[in-house]
UniProtKB/Swiss-Prot annotation:
Chain sites annotated for binding a divalent metal cation 1: D222, D233, E433
Organism of origin: Coccidioides posadasii (strain C735) (Valley fever fungus)
Amino-acid positions noted as binding substrate in the UniProt annotation, renumbered to this chain: H202, H310
Record-linked InterPro entries: Creatinase/aminopeptidase-like, Met_Aminopeptidase_Type2, Pept_M24, Pept_M24_MAP, Pept_M24A_MAP2, Pept_M24A_MAP2_BS, WH-like_DNA-bd_sf, WH_DNA-bd_sf
Protein name: Methionine aminopeptidase 2
Organismal lineage: Eukaryota, Fungi, Dikarya, Ascomycota, Pezizomycotina
Amino acid sequence: MAVQALPEINKLSVSEEGAANAAAKGQAAQGTAGNDDAENDESDEDKEDEQEVADGAAAAGGKKKKKKTKKKKKKGTAKVQSDPPRVPLSTLFPNNNYPEGEIVEYKDDNAYRTTNEEKRYLDRMNNDFLTDYRKSAEIHRQVRQYAQKELLKPGRSLTEIAEGIEDSVRALTGHMGLEEGDSLVAGMGFPTGLNINHCAAHYSPNAGNKMVLQYGDVMKVDFGVHVNGRIVDSAFTVAFDPVYDNLLNAVKDATNTGIREAGIDVRMSDIGAAIQETMESYEVEINGTIYPVKAIRNLNGHTIGHYLIHGGSTGKSVPIVKGGDQTKMEEGETYAIETFGSTGKGFVRDDMEVSHYAKVPDAPNVPLRLSSAKNLLNVITKNFGTLPFCRRYLDRLGQEKYLLGLNNLVSSGLVDAYPPLVDVKGSYTAQFEHTILLRPNVKEVITRGDDY
């Protein structure tokens, strides 16, 4: 989920305190989980049959007679994901051994960390949260694989796409979010962003939205998954017309550059400079006109905290252009490395109808005069904490005629509204994003998959 560089918009942050109350990657669950146990069971049973025949023959003092052993049925069967995804991930991985992300060794001055015994021990002692992160990431991979195959097609409505993604995420976490507090255990990390063409971020369809995905559109698909507050944030761009391929390639390459450069003690300014150099080496030709791909200079990557999508008040931003500050990345931090490219000005502003909201963490007590605002704040606190939400999520909970109360919460400073961010009309924007963990001994690209 995008964070806009200050001062254009405040960071979207969520409070740990409020929420705490509450095979290969992407393919691993597609038929492999459970096979090993089943095969081992069958092998052991066959050996027992052979031994019984041999023992019987020896006791009789005669020749060994070959006995045709019956083939035992496997006790376990391959567990596969359904289409659409509805099998909880805990069923596919009963031992909670979820696929790890892409493991990248540190380089240069930090190369020693990979083999340093002290760092390896520290990593083992502090990796309890990895199970939650890896579960979130595997859910993201499986859901986006389904979306790419079945949902993201011309002619589909944005509402159908968003609800298809979100219903799948909830089903795989095993928490549908209809009971009070259930969404705080596991579910959506933030609303599904479906940002078309010049819209770069923070657009999700509200009730009654009639927008339909077209063949000539360039759409950014940005959604988050959390398990026990461990949020993974990952995004990709789809375009059906190959004329936009270079735009997508530029941004994907830039994101991978940012991931490669990121690491412990690395300065944000150095990462931003490398990202911009990579992205702006590309150009794209559309209808006979050549456009340079520009990095959107007021959008950034960001830290992710426990129930904190943008790291809270102590969060850090990862620029995608040169000239950033000298802040360094540190051991143990989690980052969303995301880059945005545009054929327009390379600068976004607020526009269009708001869909994204989040409760302000540590907000002061403000007297609310509207009873509807008081009731709505209670619903938000108990169901989302400070995780971002959208109007459709309130609709799911049966809330009605809540806009007046919601606007009152925004004007009172208790809830932040996050309008869509757009470049100039007629331009096209693209986004790619991954979540990375700066573990003591290695860097783990937790959301990496076969697709991007």
